[in-house]
UniProtKB/Swiss-Prot annotation:
This is UPF0145 protein LSEI_0651. Gene3D superfamilies: Hypothetical protein apc22750. Chain B. Belongs to the UPF0145 family. InterPro entries: UPF0145_dom_sf, UPF0145_YbjQ-like. It comes from the Bacteria.
Length: 108
């Protein structure tokens, strides 16, 4: 099950030896609807957090991690080390998020 894939931002996992399988990533691109964009535009005028976009980014990160786990499992990995995020905007209302790292297989 992909949920059992350990994901860490560190290079080493205490007490574990492993062999490197290779790079894996999970990618998602999300957008908000027109009504959310109007609300964000109004919030931009008065200042403050744009909750709809914060929620979208949180959801995007969770989806990217889920896909990263799936890719690591397909590659035969037990864990992903050195996990990182990257994100970028596509147009005015779309956000792309990638989670990437190195899939590894534990040695017995």
């Amino acid at each position: 099950m992909a949920q059992e894939i350990l994901i860490t931002t560190t290079e080493n996992i205490p007490g574990k030896k492993y062999e490197v399988i290779g790079e894996v990533f999970g990618l998602t691109t999300q957008s908000k609807n027109v009504i959310s964009n109007i609300g964000a535009g109004l919030k931009n005028i008065v200042g403050g957090e744009i909750k709809a976009y914060s929620d979208m980014l949180h959801e995007s990160r969770e989806k990217a991690i889920e896909r990263l786990r799936d890719e690591a499992q397909k590659a035969g990995g037990d864990a992903v080390v050195m996990m990182r995020f990257d994100s970028g905007s596509i147009g005015g209302d779309m956000q792309s998020v990638v989670a990437y790292g190195t899939a590894v297989k534990f040695l017995n």
